[in-house]
Amino acid sequence: MTHPKELPFSTLQFYATAPYPCSYLDDRQARSQVATPAHLINADVYSELVKNGFRRSGIFTYRPHCDGCEACTPVRIVVDQFIPNRSQRRAQSRHSDLQTSVTKLVYLAEHYDLYLRYQAARHAGGGMDQDSREQYAQFLLQSKVNTRLVEFREDDGTLRMVSIIDVLDDGLSSVYTFYDPDEANSSYGTYNVLWQIEQARMLQIPYVYLGYWIEESPKMSYKKNFQPLEALRRGEWQVLP
């Protein structure tokens, strides 16, 4: 893992949080390394931070800094080498009629309602299913970098999915996506990643950053379906077998 003093961020400071319960692996404690001050982390600086394994939640920019654990692995899709597999092609075909709208960050009650439904169905008991409007906005609608909100709707206007995406100098960073949980085996999440890959191709930027992958976490297993996938290990990006 690259040490902050080796990064070209002489105006930033980095500190480690106190331990807290890990969100991904049961019975483990996690810590984060946080980049501050937030007002100095603009789009260019954030792009470099992402290349070095950082992510953001609202204006909170961090990377894992756990004692004795390196399970969280930053991963990114190599756009110009990606070829969809059969199930991904099915997802592409199934949802190709969805209408997309790319906007700046904005609060809509319709988005918030979908977010709560998604959390209640997919992450019940995790705390986020009880998020207030203020917590939702702090998590997804506060950004000091180049961020877009993407709506996916049916022809009749029915909202199916919302995605928050950061535009970096070398790729797109998938911040968070939530979708209609009422359709079983909808493959909305897969379609969303495919959409981001196509957007990166159009923008002629080489990567789609998917955040962290944990081998032991079933919730993250879908990320390995997008090949070739690169992982940041010991400060170097390398193809993940």
Curated annotation (Swiss-Prot):
It is an enzyme of class 2 (transferase). Keywords: Acyltransferase, Cytoplasm, Transferase. Its main location: cytoplasm. It catalyses: N-terminal L-glutamyl-[protein] + L-leucyl-tRNA(Leu) = N-terminal L-leucyl-L-glutamyl-[protein] + tRNA(Leu) + H(+); N-terminal L-aspartyl-[protein] + L-leucyl-tRNA(Leu) = N-terminal L-leucyl-L-aspartyl-[protein] + tRNA(Leu) + H(+). Its EC number is 2.3.2.29. Disulfide bonds: none annotated. One of its GO terms (biological process) is ubiquitin-dependent protein catabolic process via the N-end rule pathway. The keyword Cytoplasm applies. It is found in: Cytoplasm. GO terms for cellular component: cytoplasm. InterPro entries: Acyl_CoA_acyltransferase (IPR016181), Asp_Glu_LeuTrfase (IPR017138), N-end_Aminoacyl_Trfase (IPR030700), N-end_Aminoacyl_Trfase_C (IPR007472), N-end_Aminoacyl_Trfase_N (IPR007471). The keyword Transferase applies. It holds the Pfam family ATE_N. GO terms for molecular function: arginyl-tRNA--protein transferase activity; leucyl-tRNA--protein transferase activity. Belongs to the R-transferase family. Bpt subfamily. Functions in the N-end rule pathway of protein degradation where it conjugates Leu from its aminoacyl-tRNA to the N-termini of proteins containing an N-terminal aspartate or glutamate. HAMAP family: Bpt. This is Aspartate/glutamate leucyltransferase. It comes from Herminiimonas arsenicoxydans. The gene is bpt.
